[in-house]
Amino acid sequence: MSGTHKKLGARHKARKRAVDFLFEAEARDLDPVDLATERAELSGKDDSVAPVAPYTVTVVTGVAENLDRLDEVIRSHLQDWTLERLPAVDRAILRIAVWELFHATDVPPVVAVDEAVELAKQLSTDESPGFVNGILGQVVLVAPQVRSAAAATSRRTETAGGESNDAGS
């Protein structure tokens, strides 16, 4: 049990660090993947720089690679708000949670939502946890279909790739 608790604690810290990188990258107009990678390299050389967990880099990379789709999903669930009007930290938290709901098959949906709400409690406004929970409560309903479609597309791509290689030989 304590091993599970430690693992969840490590994942929580990795998510929080991912929020930090996404927030900083947006504020400074930097590439978030480059930022996370540079910090990871720097942490290996400079003990004063906190280590960057591999899951942090995975999340930041996943969000960056799927940013347009993630933002589209978040926008579709906003009522009387625009994505740009949200606090930047809320955008980062929502992007991470939606990415986990759609792509992190080892993260149960309830964990992705709970972690996002907890990060909003720690890092954002008093209204943010309820707002984040409301948006993700809607997104979680479509997540299984999105995961299934992504898996089917991936299988078709792998099959087509194999066939085209054989045909070209």
Swiss-Prot record:
InterPro entries referenced in this protein's UniProt entry, alphabetically: NusB-like_sf, NusB_fam, NusB_RsmB_TIM44
Top-rank lineage group of the source organism: Bacteria
Record keywords, A-Z: RNA-binding, Transcription, Transcription antitermination, Transcription regulation
GO biological process terms on file: DNA-templated transcription termination; transcription antitermination
SUPFAM superfamilies documented for this protein: NusB-like (SSF48013)
One term under GO cellular component: cytosol
Region feature Disordered, mapped onto this chain: 150-169
Gene Ontology MF terms: RNA binding
Function text: Involved in transcription antitermination. Required for transcription of ribosomal RNA (rRNA) genes. Binds specifically to the boxA antiterminator sequence of the ribosomal RNA (rrn) operons.
Family: Belongs to the NusB family.
Protein name as catalogued: Transcription antitermination protein NusB
Organism: Rhodococcus jostii (strain RHA1)
